[in-house]
């Protein structure tokens, strides 16, 4: 588990010394030793590695890493470029992007371009046992990622939160910064996308907010590979 550096280390480095994190570390280490676990251990903190704290302009909160082979690589909703099957929730995100901003629907689900522009693609739980959704919930990741969210909340500049579904929206009480914008919608899963995710226009709303406050908007178009 490659640790954090830079501003992230200053903001949440103390978490690594807390008893809950020691227990979490031991649990995750044992899981990797005895089961197939995703993402690869070196990718666990990719959301923070790709998006430094002082560059965050949007936070998209997911729940659990993808749990099938060759998918998860540490960014919520994103899959590796070699994965040609785009997960259903991401397909629906692309549909909304197409309807909202006219983005072409790409042939891959690799969202690193967003992360490189300041979109923090954070899951609340950072590891999962293969083919067992939610298998690493309740072991301490939630406490750690709450510290990440709190660090973002403390940033004194315009930031947009996209909170899709009830688990993500349960974090709203933590988000107290008046300079930040909270956008809520149902989850893009096929089970709920038609209840209000489609038509939410979060991507254009985020860019309008950023531009109004003098921040470079996000280029949401993912290119074909």
Curated annotation (Swiss-Prot):
<keyword id="KW-0227">DNA damage</keyword>
<protein>
    <recommendedName>
        <fullName>Uracil-DNA glycosylase</fullName>
        <ecNumber>3.2.2.27</ecNumber>
    </recommendedName>
</protein>
<keyword id="KW-0963">Cytoplasm</keyword>
<dbReference type="InterPro" id="IPR002043">
    <property type="entry name" value="UDG_fam1"/>
</dbReference>
<dbReference type="GO" id="GO:0004844">
    <property type="term" value="F:uracil DNA N-glycosylase activity"/>
</dbReference>
<dbReference type="InterPro" id="IPR018085">
    <property type="entry name" value="Ura-DNA_Glyclase_AS"/>
</dbReference>
<dbReference type="Pfam" id="PF03167">
    <property type="entry name" value="UDG"/>
</dbReference>
<comment type="function">
    <text>Excises uracil residues from the DNA which can arise as a result of misincorporation of dUMP residues by DNA polymerase or due to deamination of cytosine.</text>
</comment>
<keyword id="KW-0378">Hydrolase</keyword>
<dbReference type="GO" id="GO:0005737">
    <property type="term" value="C:cytoplasm"/>
</dbReference>
<keyword id="KW-0234">DNA repair</keyword>
<feature type="active site" description="Proton acceptor">
    <location>
        <position position="64"/>
    </location>
</feature>
<dbReference type="GO" id="GO:0097510">
    <property type="term" value="P:base-excision repair, AP site formation via deaminated base removal"/>
</dbReference>
<comment type="similarity">
    <text>Belongs to the uracil-DNA glycosylase (UDG) superfamily. UNG family.</text>
</comment>
<dbReference type="InterPro" id="IPR036895">
    <property type="entry name" value="Uracil-DNA_glycosylase-like_sf"/>
</dbReference>
<dbReference type="InterPro" id="IPR005122">
    <property type="entry name" value="Uracil-DNA_glycosylase-like"/>
</dbReference>
